[in-house]
Structure formats: structure tokens, C-alpha cells
Regions:
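Short, well-structured N-terminal submotif of metal-dependent ribonuclease cores
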Residues: 1-36, 45-58, 134-139
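A secondary-structure boundary/capping signal
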Residues: 5-6, 40, 111
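Structured helix-beta-strand junction loops
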Residues: 31-32, 62-63, 86, 104, ...
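General small-molecule cofactor/ligand-binding pocket signal
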Residues: 35, 66, 127
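Active-site neighborhoods of divalent-metal-dependent phosphate/nucleic-acid chemistry enzymes
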Residues: 65-109
């Protein structure tokens, strides 16, 4: 299972979006390995065009959902402190997404550089697609 960040969903749904991202997301969806959480849903759906909203809501309804818990908020606060001590400031929403993935022991697929910082400082796992976007079951 891979928690797909909003940066990937948004890029994949752009008309001129990166074809590699589109293929990689398709690979995760085809293998039933894509997951989402409420933070991702908020980020994606709040920026969706009116004509896309129903299709996106339907798509999210059939993908595995990982809830955000109080423990995820606590983890995010601790993570923010660790990052700040090393000179990094990361958005609260990205911290929550990382917390959900960390608790579920799964990787995050993101284009956002903050996740690379969190990988380096906090040890979160990041997903790297396989050849031509095929699902890569291995670790980072």
C-alpha cells in the first residue's frame, strides 16, 4: 500500500501533467495499492474544478482510506520540532500525511520536496515507481 500525496493527484489530473506521474498513479491504482487520507482528500477536492468534483469524489470513495488519528497529530508535533531543530519548516498538512503513512508502515508517493526532507530527518518511506510507472513493491 502507498499513500498518494495530493501533489501526485493534482499533477496526474492536469491536462498537461507529467506523463510519468500519470503512469505511476495508474500503476498504483491498477494494482490496488493506492491509498488516501482525509488531508489528501481536502487538498485535492478543495481545488477541483466544478466539473471534476463528482468524478473525483467517486474515485476517492473506492480507494482505501486511512484515517487521521489523534496520535498522528501528536507525531506531527514531535516531527515539526525535530525538523525545526534542523532548520526545516514543513506544512502541517504534509506532516499529517507523513504521520498517517508512518503509523500504517507504508510509503508516501509525493513530488513535494518536503517529503524528501522528512525522509532524511524522520525516516519516512518514499515510493519510487517502477519502469514505465509499473507498481514497485520494493522499499525506497
Amino acid at each position: 500500500m502507498v499513500l498518494v500525496d495530493s501533489s501526485i493527484w493534482i499533477e496526474a489530473f492536469r491536462r498537461q501533467g507529467d506523463v510519468h506521474v500519470k503512469l505511476a498513479l495508474k500503476g498504483l491504482l491498477d494494482e490496488y495499492e493506492a491509498a488516501w487520507c482525509s488531508v489528501v482528500k481536502l487538498e485535492v477536492l478543495s481545488g477541483a474544478r466544478k466539473e471534476e468534483r463528482k468524478a473525483l469524489t467517486t474515485r476517492f470513495s473506492i480507494i482505501p482510506f486511512l484515517p487521521v488519528t489523534e496520535a498522528d497529530y501528536d507525531w506531527s508535533v514531535d516531527a515539526a520540532w525535530k525538523l525545526r531543530e534542523r532548520g526545516h519548516v514543513v506544512k502541517s498538512t504534509d506532516l499529517l500525511i507523513a504521520a498517517v503513512a508512518q503509523r500504517a508502515d507504508i510509503r508516501v508517493y509525493a513530488q513535494d520536496k518536503h517529503f524528501e526532507i522528512m525522509r532524511d530527518v524522520l525516516g519516512i518511506g518514499l515510493y519510487q515507481p517502477g519502469y514505465n510507472g509499473m507498481y514497485n513493491p520494493g522499499t525506497e
